[in-house]
């Protein structure tokens, strides 16, 4: 039995949900998202609640929990949106956003340029902080991970691109061997 899929999803007043065959479309003030519902799962809409119905097989129970989580993320995304904050830690590390292009100096001999997906917006409140926002949680996480991958934080000095809430496990530098 799936504990996640048993919980109904409440639909806010500002969100419109349309279920057509095996496609669910969710639209709100921030945008519109759609999702293909797996064959072993069905979604029923009753007023402002969505319930997930599924079979007895282990596969359909697992898909039901995943489907419920993804649809809930879609509803939150189109009503409130998601944000991720990245910090650039290191001497001379800075970022500048212009439209859909993010240009970063990360200690390489050349600036790193990253073009953001259409649904992801970027702001740089300071030179060492990048704020990404989107209504699509998956796309936002993918873009943030790709930016972080240019220079992941290293454990000795902590330099690199890190998430704002990420804690870097620090290591101690190797000590010179004492006289044998």
Model-assigned labels for residue ranges:
Residues 2-133, 137-145, 149-180:
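N-terminal intrinsically disordered, cationic/polar leader segments
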């Amino acid at each position: 039995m799936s504990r996640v899929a048993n919980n109904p999803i409440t639909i806010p007043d500002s969100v419109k949900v349309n279920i057509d065959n095996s496609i669910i479309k969710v639209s709100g003030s921030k945008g519109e998202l759609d999702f293909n519902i797996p064959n072993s799962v069905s979604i029923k809409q009753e007023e402002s609640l969505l319930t997930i119905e599924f079979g007895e097989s282990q596969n359909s129970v697992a898909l039901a929990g995943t489907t419920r989580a993804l649809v809930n993320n879609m509803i939150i995304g189109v009503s409130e949106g998601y944000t991720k904050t990245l910090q650039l830690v290191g001497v001379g590390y800075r970022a500048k956003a212009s439209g859909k292009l993010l240009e970063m100096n990360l200690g390489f001999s050349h600036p790193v340029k990253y073009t953001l997906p259409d649904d992801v917006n970027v702001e740089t409140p300071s030179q060492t902080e990048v704020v990404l926002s989107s209504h699509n949680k998956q796309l936002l996480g993918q873009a943030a991970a790709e930016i972080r991958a240019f220079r992941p934080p290293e454990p000795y000095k902590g330099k690199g691109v890190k998430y704002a809430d990420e804690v870097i496990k620090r290591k101690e530098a190797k000590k010179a061997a004492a006289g044998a």
